[in-house]
Amino acid sequence: MAEKKAVTSHEPVVGLELELEEFSGTYTNPGYGAFTFCSPSGSSSYCQDVISDFTAVDSVQSSAPHSLQLLAAWPRIWASHIRAVHQSGNKFLVQWTSLFPEGYGRDITPFETAEIGTSDATAEFVVEDGKVVGFGLVGLVGQLTERERTHATVKDRVDVWFDKA
């Protein structure tokens, strides 16, 4: 498995439209299922477990992101967690990652990995009437799609749409 790279951005950072906590919550998609994003201030037992896992891994990595983040557990065959790092506006860089907060085997050093060939995607959140209604993912195919090029609304141009529950 490949080690995750440091998250960097070359675009000027523009703040979020709402507080980060407003972007936390459960999101659903009929094909991908549901997951819950936690902000660093998430207080539920689920969020405390997720934050603890990421904190353990990030504490031993020099390349850990220092930007605003949303974090989620997402146990699948190719990943155990999702890390969404704020880029600009309502856009986040989404990384599917596998966390080993207690190490593996005899080595108890926490670490994070990602499958070779998986690409990061961009999540663009949509806010209507002061509330987050969902987000769309683009970049899953690794190149600009016809939908991205020709459609105006986020929901129409993304590869996958998640509704906020």
Stretch-by-stretch model annotation:
Residues 1-165:
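Peripheral terminal and inter-domain segments
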